[in-house]
Amino acid sequence: MQILLVEDDNTLFQELKKELEQWDFNVAGIEDFGKVMDTFESFNPEIVILDVQLPKYDGFYWCRKMREVSNVPILFLSSRDNPMDQVMSMELGADDYMQKPFYTNVLIAKLQAIYRRVYEFTAEEKRTLTWQDAVIDLSKDSIQKGDQTIFLSKTEMIILEILITKKNQIVSRDTIITALWDDEAFVSDNTLTVNVNRLRKKLSEIGMDSAIETKVGKGYMAHE
């Protein structure tokens, strides 16, 4: 597994690198924190571990840059005790988040879970769903409508798949949150709202503004 570890604390970087390599992960770091994307593009990681507090530009900046060109899984690290860091990471499409200090074995378990969820699923036979006049490719986390294509994060796609399989039915927030936890995604009531809002914004880009309806106090409904 190719891991890009974007961490400016050299002591922590070396400790994590040594531990990850014992699990046969191939780990690369950053030499110039103004050129993170150069290393990202040349190393082509399968997962990125991204610290929030970095010199020159913060981790949120680099997450945006990565999301412009890739859906690679991103796990954020942060030493700040600030819930908004977690919310921001979700808004930017991160796959997981850990607050420092943390147990290395928990980090490794999260990396393995992300890898299984992303790469073992995408290696399966292509799966598609038809919804309204759009085609949803579950293996690529994409939606195509006419000549327009949008890409979703793994969490957004799970939410959408749950709603579509129960079209014209109200799906409770608790049902969605439970499904996401079962899939080893990290989510709370607040981050579910963030993900649904981000999903709606992406759907609006292809003219599907009212495809998902909020049922106040009950949950969400995907219309036929």
UniProtKB/Swiss-Prot annotation:
Example of a GO cellular component annotation carried by this entry: cytosol
Post-translational modification note: Phosphorylated by GraS. Phosphorylated by Stk1; phosphorylation increases the DNA-binding activity of GraR.
Quaternary structure and interacting proteins, as annotated: Interacts with GraX.
Primary location group: cytoplasm
Species the sequence originates in: Staphylococcus aureus (strain MRSA252)
GO BP of this protein: regulation of DNA-templated transcription; response to antibiotic
Response regulatory domain residues: 2-115
Modified residues (Phosphothreonine): T128, T130, T149
Biological role stated in the UniProt entry: Member of the two-component regulatory system GraR/GraS involved in resistance against cationic antimicrobial peptides (CAMPs). Upon phosphorylation by GraS, functions as a transcription regulator by direct binding to promoter regions of target genes such as adhesins, exoproteins, transporters, toxins, and proteins involved in cell wall synthesis. Down-regulates the expression of many genes involved in RNA and amino acid synthesis or glycolysis.
UniProt DNA-binding region: 126-224
Keywords assigned: Activator, Antibiotic resistance, Cytoplasm, DNA-binding, Phosphoprotein, Repressor, Transcription, Transcription regulation, Two-component regulatory system, Virulence
Residues where 4-aspartylphosphate is found: D51
Subcellular location: Cytoplasm
Domain of life: Bacteria
GO MF annotation terms: phosphorelay response regulator activity; transcription cis-regulatory region binding
Entry keyword Transcription regulation: yes
Keyword Kinase part of the UniProt annotation: no
Protein name: Response regulator protein GraR
PANTHER family recorded: REGULATOR OF RPOS, SENSORY TRANSDUCTION PROTEIN BCER
Organism placement in taxonomy: Bacteria, Bacillati, Bacillota, Bacilli, Bacillales
